[in-house]
Amino acid sequence: MRKCKIFVGNSHPELGNMVCQRLGIEPAPCTLKKFANGETSVQIGVSVRDEDVYVIQSGSPSINDDIMELLILVSACRGGSARKITAVIPQFPYSKQCKMKRHRGAITARMLANLLVMAGADHVVSMDLHASQMQGFFTKPVDNLYGGPSLAKWIRENVEDYEDAVVVSKNPGGTKRVTALADSLKINFAMIHTDRRRSKDLYSQNKDLQQLKLRKQSMLRKNRPIIRQGDHPNEEENIILSNGIQTARIRNGHVIGDDEADDDEDAILESDSELHSIDGLDSHGLGGTYDAVDSEDEEEIPVLYREQLITLVGNVRGRSAIILDDMIDRPGSFISAAEHLVQNCGAKKVYVVATHGIFTGDCLEELEKSDAIDTIVVTNTYPISGERIAGSKKLVTIDVSPIFAECIRRDHYGESISVLFDSLAAL
């Protein structure tokens, strides 16, 4: 590839080097270091004048340092008269902060987009942005590549009887992503909903556990069809809107039985003033907020909401369940969803599948310890240490470097990259 330079940052050198290897070129030389006072220093060791420059820098545990390194690299290439600068960011940092959740908050993802453009980026390439609307944050072209085809290919090759499996969204905000994968695999899908407020109202008005059982039974109308008049007289048509609704209780992130006593009722019931203050937060148990375009589940659950109602809309009995999300950050919502699928809904196996394996803190270890989860599948857009990979028996990592390499090659030669968005392009 003539007139092309690829710089690999410190965030994920393994992925960057794999991309360069597939393209048959060496990473462009540059010196990345820190001064004694913590400032980042970047020195480019080659001319970039009139060259196509690609800077590969993903999210990482040292996220703020790596963002600064990316901005300085882009700015240095702009100062070196590069013809075009493309920031390749496999896992876009701060993507969860893509909307204002509280008054006086900041839309940090938009701010980062502005910083990239101001530094000199002409083009941005990423994969599975937390919300596709984030592409509108940029005033430059953005290519949001899909990890779904690679995940679908792995499912076809490794999930037994995948034709009978069910793709599950663990919150309402992820249904669009789930239905897209289910359509490409031609299999069924289901959705999990966790209601904090319903559980709170129930306990604040009825402290008797029997009331909870009665309410749950009223929700368990499995396969009850809706009858409507047919097209001809005396003809009725059965319309089944769903294959079943299974509801259970969650306490402190784990599914509990209906007959389990309320050990800490005082922790569940708070003063009226506290109830009023939390009612103002339009939040969702497993899915951040009730905004359907978002799917955050990593907010700390207040004491009041530690007991919740979790509901599956769909049928996974005797089937493999594939819980799909864009990233795995913290384990709580995945574990509670998997436990509900296995213990109450009869799932045969549970696969946790995501594009970005962030695994904050001991997330991977907690998922590993869960008996309800059989396999964890992620791509290598985010760096995972070799020690953690070696210590996990459930983790599977899919290499997506061919997708980024092909994207760079096609972009450099002015070819269309629409094939990378095709459901068959599981490279």
From Swiss-Prot:
Residue(s) carrying Phosphoserine: 199, 218, 271, 295
Listed GO MF terms: ATP binding; kinase activity; magnesium ion binding; ribose phosphate diphosphokinase activity
Gene3D superfamilies from the UniProt entry: 3.40.50.2020
Pfam families, sorted: Pribosyl_synth, Pribosyltran_N
Functional pathway: Metabolic intermediate biosynthesis; 5-phospho-alpha-D-ribose 1-diphosphate biosynthesis; 5-phospho-alpha-D-ribose 1-diphosphate from D-ribose 5-phosphate (route I): step 1/1
Keywords from the named record: ATP-binding, Cytoplasm, Kinase, Magnesium, Metal-binding, Nucleotide biosynthesis, Nucleotide-binding, Phosphoprotein, Transferase
Cellular location(s): Cytoplasm
EC code(s) of this entry: 2.7.6.1
GO cellular component, one term: cytoplasm
Binding site for Mg(2+): 128, 130, 143
Reaction(s) this enzyme catalyzes, per UniProt: D-ribose 5-phosphate + ATP = 5-phospho-alpha-D-ribose 1-diphosphate + AMP + H(+)
A GO BP annotation: purine nucleotide biosynthetic process
Function summary: 5-phosphoribose 1-diphosphate synthase involved in nucleotide, histidine, and tryptophan biosynthesis. Active in heteromultimeric complexes with other 5-phosphoribose 1-diphosphate synthases (PRS2, PRS3, PRS4 and PRS5).
Family in the record: Belongs to the ribose-phosphate pyrophosphokinase family.
Misc remark: Present with 11700 molecules/cell in log phase SD medium.
Name under which the protein is recorded: Ribose-phosphate pyrophosphokinase 1
Source lineage: Eukaryota, Fungi, Dikarya, Ascomycota, Saccharomycotina
Gene transcribed to yield this protein: PRS1
